[in-house]
């Protein structure tokens, strides 16, 4: 389906036009809004959720990766310890909303972050040739959940890694008001010498809605996809937690999965209406180091952590 309308950026992004409303009362009143318009054009929304996977030969395969099918595959991989995989003693992860690669300096920052990461979780990713070449040059493989296609280029969330996942699935949910989807990638990675796998969730959460229904449904779907996973989990991304009610939804999902949020002593995460939007939650992992890195190359500051498997 092709939807010809203004392509709307995230509510919190820098723009000459800002949404004006009493957002703390958002669920009680449908407030008039002015939205930051990026460009006008035609956005293609595929009938089925669209996933893109980089193959071992460098080609890109487009397919549907429904989580209902993939979860059983991931569970079947828990058999014997693997000789190859992520180092369970040192897992370096970074999550970053890259703002559609629209800010100066993103290439230099991404190159640095990719070199220092085992897992790179990107949101608002435009899968153009420049981005693909940079990830390839970093020696990483990737899988993407496409939210929509604009000017024949996919935009969505992308997980890049130094080790190929044993399984991945994608989820997509449509924003209630803007009708543009938000997406998630869930991947299961082998851990060297371990029988279990590490589940990694990369989420760009719904931003613009009058109620919490769709927002809660997005997190419920992720929880359901992880219901059979007994091993460690990383749950991260731009969760758009700009109200206390949204934070409560995320906390409830985290509680169901036994997740703990990583804290930051020097917290440089960007704020929107007094709340951080970018988070990393974990289960079965110890935090060795964590930080939020101040940048000018996006409207979000990347968040990183070094983790190790809990013994």
Language-model segments: residues:
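Structured beta-strand-rich core segments of catalytic domains in phosphoester-bond hydrolases
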Residues: 52-80, 119, 123-197, 293-294
